């Protein structure tokens, strides 16, 4: 089996209650042995995952149970080998918090033609389903590339 190039991945979005918890759980499932966590640039500290996000994930066999929102800190960012952000603006915010991590910060949708993953917060269930599909495809692509 090929050796993984990264031992730890941090998934970042805005509030750490919708996109990044799903991305975290999908990558954990696909990359066993890799430490995968999530945080938000404006993290809603200790908040559970958004109810619609949790329902949509559960419908696809992914549990967000036990998730507690975290706010990104510079120290946290430094402690991960790879940081995957949902939007270009998140990359800018991560860089403002910890400039030295810019070189290891990329879009979660990097392998989906560098697509940003839109925020479904307070939108319809269909919006959450669309975002889940993007996160699913992006996590598959990351797992393929990181497992080589």
From Swiss-Prot:
Signal peptide: none annotated. InterPro entries: LMW_PTPase, Ptyr_pPase, Ptyr_pPase_sf, Tyr_phospatase_low_mol_wt. Its EC number is 3.1.3.48. Gene3D superfamilies: 3.40.50.2300. One of its GO terms (molecular function) is protein tyrosine phosphatase activity. It comes from the Bacteria. This is Low molecular weight protein-tyrosine-phosphatase Etp.
